[in-house]
């Protein structure tokens, strides 16, 4: 949900782990200090391994498009990322990537440039973009560099516009709730 002048509105069904890292940290804190909420935690979920699960999600997306080519750099992008509600999570993901040996940055999508077949921020090439934009199809002119790099397959974007169109576009909920179409 996003808040605008008309109040909260559904804009997507998440295709990424948005909010998951913050929730994992909160769950670990609750588990460590609060026996009274222990009943709320599934025994088969290892909070200690959740970061590995999150990282595996990004690596699987990378490998699906790049095979065994090594992933070196990740850009976590949004418009004005420091102003976003989940900005602390962006930083947590950046730290996770760096702990695993990847160069990682949190950057405003408008600061990206596409030059000579490579998406870059300043002088640094970007291999994978963790896309937190709500411009799901990258149609806004300010995201032109990312759109061109993505359509040329010069960067891996996750989640990518096609994933949103297939799995997360809220307009699909109409179809999913139409008994006649589902019959």
Task: Give, region by region, the residue ranges found by the protein language model.
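Short hydrophobic beta-strand that contains or immediately precedes a catalytic carboxylate
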Residues: 10-17
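Domain-scale recognition of functional cores that engage charged ligands
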Residues: 2-5, 19-24, 28-183
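Conserved acidic functional residues
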Residues: 1-2, 12
């Amino acid at each position: 949900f996003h808040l605008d002048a008309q109040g909260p509105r559904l804009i997507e069904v998440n295709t990424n782990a948005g909010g998951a890292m913050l929730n994992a940290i909160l769950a670990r804190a609750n588990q460590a200090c609060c026996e009274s909420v222990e009943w709320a935690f599934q025994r088969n979920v290892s909070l200690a391994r959740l970061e590995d699960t999150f990282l595996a999600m990004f690596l699987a997306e990378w490998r699906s498009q790049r095979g065994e080519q090594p992933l070196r750099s990740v850009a976590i992008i949004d418009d004005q990322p420091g102003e976003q509600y989940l900005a602390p999570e962006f930083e947590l993901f950046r730290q996770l990537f760096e702990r695993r040996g990847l160069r990682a940055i949190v950057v405003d999508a408008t600061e990206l440039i596409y030059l000579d077949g490579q998406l870059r921020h300043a002088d640094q090439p970007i291999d994978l973009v963790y896309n937190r934009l709500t411009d799901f199809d990258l149609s806004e002119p300010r995201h032109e560099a990312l759109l061109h790099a993505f359509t040329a397959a010069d960067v891996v974007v996750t989640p990518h516009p096609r994933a949103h169109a297939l799995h997360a576009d809220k307009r699909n909920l109409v179809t999913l709730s139409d008994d006649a179409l589902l019959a």
